[in-house]
A protein has these predicted regions:
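Eukaryotic helix-grip
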Residues: 2-259
């Protein structure tokens, strides 16, 4: 999920916007920092039954976005082992991209789930914390992204679920709320309607790739509606370098694991 928002955030320094068009408040000093809370049975401050109901619907929406293909999407990029598509939505926008990797779906997902390594391939992350795990397949993670120019930093508070869709590995994320984890002063909380990763086996190609990865997100980044179209298209152009970073760190991780 992080990579989609990271690319959206990276477009802020390219978008010009007057102060009159933006309603972001100036950052204020705030000593409060989100503290890590881990409880295997429940996570303090969150309503698990409500989250479970919400994620059930989100998984269905995720599956629909995966299965609908790219009809109606704008093609943002299509070369060098990476295809990027985007479309406007009634709320926010949808970004979808695919690329292939020379590792199995299980190996790829294992690497992407290692929170401690995310900053090695996503330089836009300022801070990331696991708030807690309900079990090995369900977690809540807080992520804060770096500020760009006059734009306030973005942050997400997301519930993540590892599951199977169409018989393939997937990780689906949605935004959650908690009074214990309010939006920090000087930051804008991004709303994730649904986001995630989907990894499926493919016939090995000439480069040794054997998994097709699809990453998608439907989000509201807290931008004025007039800027969504510009943001989604520019964000799409920043994705290919990110996928290359992921592949580089993925290879490094498994090479070092053999030592």
């Amino acid at each position: 999920m992080g990579q989609e928002l990271s690319n959206m955030c990276s477009c802020f320094d390219k978008i010009q916007e007057s102060k009159q068009e933006m309603s972001f408040n100036s950052p204020q000093d705030k000593s409060h920092v989100h503290e890590e809370i881990v409880d295997s049975d429940e996570i303090q401050g969150f309503d698990y039954p409500a989250i479970s109901k919400k994620i059930s619907e989100a998984v269905g929406n995720f599956k629909q976005l995966i299965c609908e293909g790219v009809t109606g999407y704008d093609v943002i990029f299509d070369k060098e082992n990476c295809k990027v598509y985007s479309k406007e939505a009634s709320e926010g926008y949808v970004l979808k991209y695919t690329w292939n990797v020379p590792y199995s779906p299980k190996e790829f997902m294992k690497f992407m789930d290692i929170v401690e390594l995310r900053k090695t391939w996503d330089s836009n992350i300022d801070n990331i914390k696991v708030i807690g795990f309900y079990n090995p397949k369900e977690s809540i993670i807080y992520t804060r992204y770096k500020k760009f120019l006059a734009f306030d930093p973005r942050e997400t508070l997301a519930y993540n679920k590892s599951t199977h869709i169409n018989g393939n590995l997937a990780e689906v994320s949605i935004s959650v709320e908690s009074d214990l984890f309010p939006e920090l002063d000087g930051a804008v909380r991004v709303y994730l309607y649904v986001a995630g990763l989907y990894a499926e086996d493919i016939e090995p190609d000439e480069f040794g790739n054997k998994t097709k990865v699809t990453c998608l997100s439907h989000m509201d980044a807290g931008l004025p509606k007039a800027l969504n179209n510009v943001a989604r298209k520019f964000a799409g152009t920043t994705i290919p370098p990110l996928t290359k970073k992921i592949c580089t760190q993925l290879r490094k991780y498994y090479e070092e694991s053999k030592v």
